[in-house]
Amino acid sequence: MRDFQKQGRSAVFATNGMCATSHPLAAKVAVQMLEAGGNAVDAAIAGAVLLGICEPQMTGIGGDCFVLLTPPGEDRVVALNGSGRAPAGLDANLLRDKGMTTVPLGGPEAVTIPGAVDAFCRLSADFGKLGLKASLAPAIHYADTGVPVAPRVAFDWALSTDALQGTARDAYLINGKAPTAGQIFRAPSQADVLRRIAMNGREAFYEGEVAEDMVAALNARGGVHTLADFANCASEYTAPITGGYGGLDLWEHPPNGQGATAILLLNILKHFDVAGMDPFGIERAHIEAEATKLAYDARNRFVADPDYMTKLDHMMAPETAADLAALINPKKAMPASVPGTEAVHKDTIYITVVDKDRMCVSLIYSVFHSFGSGIASDKFDVLFQNRGAGFTLDKGHPNEAGGGKRPMHTIIPGLLKKNGSNYMPFGVMGGAYQSTGHARFVTNLNDFGMDVQSAIDGPRCFADNGTLKVETTYGPDVHAGLADLGHNVMIPEGPIGGAQAIALGDDGVLIGGSDPRKDGCALGY
């Protein structure tokens, strides 16, 4: 039990259904969908699409999503990959001939086809109850009438305005400036697009007037996108991957997501007595940082479009983790591995919903960087992700940019099982941090017996491209001790990541946790 004289929040308890996400309005709408007879899929789509209006710097219909779900009464895990592909005309040789060494963050070269809309349509048709029109209605309403900008959203928005280009500045700034907390943000053009999707499904987005607007905007900036690229976009069901840690089994998406990195990281940590360490002390932070460097080095070498990746079994093998764990010196930080060419500051939303039939949905949805590419279509203001910046331009690399390929993705929804039964859908937003965030959350639960909210609240650190980012919630002695071990310690500009989770209690009670680093909450009924 937490100390109620200290700042913090309690876990949320409910019996019928629950949502945990990063904005209270989205959580409220999701619960309302459940109360109206919808299931967890209906509610998750409603909340996620609304988050594109509440947190447009993080996500939107120009982005991608990944989903894990468990059908009611079943223990099987369904994985839907809603990430889009590069346009067929993308050619890494041409980019290198232009002098590029990485895919430019704000260029059309970074814009992959948005996959989320197709995934939402497919998910609603295959697993929803109320239909897509019902799920999109709340976002349409609030896009038209507007939402007050939340404090954390305003903080992030102000840091990201330089990314916006051309007509995107008109659509996503108010009088040329980022909105402040409490100002009303409206997106009437997106409401128009969502109405069309509600009436006519995916074709209203990937074909016809909306698609023509998107292709024209990208072509005008030098993009090689075609109407056929959009029409051919299709989400895919895949076979999830899993790994055990203590009494928990972690389920993740296979590549092109980085879920295998989280499993590898936990496999490395198995070789250390994490439970015997101070949960918020120097030793645990050091070992986690070293394991992160090694696991992410493997990710940067191997993770790619599954049609091109050949090393998944190697990443998941216990022998690989044992060999990597042997490289860790408990008394000294190793040099940082060579950074991957994918950029690191990614913005994402996460939503999890559990309904009365105990269907669980774990959904993550993103435009990659804050405001993605910064490019929006001229008529409908669809803001494009820059997920193609996750490609490398290293010739022959499995994640080399190429036409029709999916880039390595950082966004990963998670799901935990206990004793073979569904236990907890969860996610940790935060770009590259997500794999480390998954591992830290799991070890908080398993090794230290933390409840859902405490496992989210605890301080975080992240070994990232030559530095060890350490939140201010760690004491100064930890900062100093890590520096003494050779880490290049820095305090990040903002908090690290943002987590949401819902546990299925043994007595049928749902227990939700939501990260105080965000504006959101867990709500149940």
Regions found by a protein language model. Name each.
Residues 357, 405, 438, 447-494:
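Extended C-terminal subregions enriched in glycine
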